Amino acid sequence: MIKASAVMNKTLCALAISLAMHSGSVFAKTFTEKDFVSQPLGHGVYELAWDKGQQALYAASAPSFDKDKTDGLVFKLAAQSLQIDAKIPMERRTFAVALDEENHILYLGNALEGSVTLLDTRTDKAIKTLQLSDNSDPEKRAHVREVVLDKKHQRLYVSGIGRKDKGLLWVVDTQKQELAQTLQKLEPVGFAVDEAGDRVYVVSGSGELITLDGKTSQLLNRVKVDPADPEHYFLNIALNTARGVGYIADTNTKDVLVVQLDSGKLLHRVPTPNSVAVLYNPAREEVYVTHRNDRQISVIDATSNRLKHTIKTTAMPNSLALSADASTLYASVKQGEKANQADYVLKIDLTKF
């Protein structure tokens, strides 16, 4: 009897550990995009930026991938109604965005050209384009993927996707508006900045969490988060600095990974499909994640790491932005490559949850 009891205790302990690592919820409520407001825009819509001062939402787009159609288009929407207030033509296709609201600059990643264009949000005119990739040198050639701003240290971090083991991390001095550093052998994909903690967290296509010094941009630490699984390809990370954790979106494998920021230790797996964007809302203690292939957005409780709600979308949700009052979530939603319908923006009223 004692032996049976010991076996039962071990079984319950193993079950508890498994549940703690793989947190889910059978009580999650499902919404559809029809519960919210949407606005069709056009083809090739990618990242979003919310401007509090103008009460505007910017959406970057690359309308065509034809070789002779390299122009980009930035949509400026009224944040409340999603009415299109302006269509801003750009010389290069636009994908990634980062907004410096105080200095009225919207940084736009030109993926295919390996550059970043600076847009004056007061005039809707381009200020300049920073050419980061050097096509004449294979060691310095890469496509821009993500741009993330560190306002405190006046830096813009830009990930460059190159050939295998040839990824680059560009550091732009935003005061001088010029390239300050180029870091190699990091294979960066996505970033998140902890300005107060003077840290920059980088996730890589090889499943690494990389930590940089926010003051110097120098490497402090790099660790494989889940070395047992070689299939990881981390796209983005969101920070919950109050709890000292990060939430990682992985495009190759299922689950949102919750990691300890100072060590890279894997703490939890939140059961979800493979992911693209991830965003943390400290005001509501929620994490939002887009799942392109499964056409849904997850709302995760950051206090319990359990799924709270699911929003089903008609097309493929891509990028996210949050209003300054933390009550509205915006998502860009993409159609399939051969679809005739326009990509669109979804405005999600979080007070409905």
Show which residues each predicted segment covers.
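Bacterial N-terminal signal peptides
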Residues: A14-H22
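Bacterial N-terminal signal peptides that target proteins for export
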Residues: I2-C13
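Predominantly soluble domains enriched in secretory-pathway, periplasmic, or organellar proteins
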Residues: G24-F353
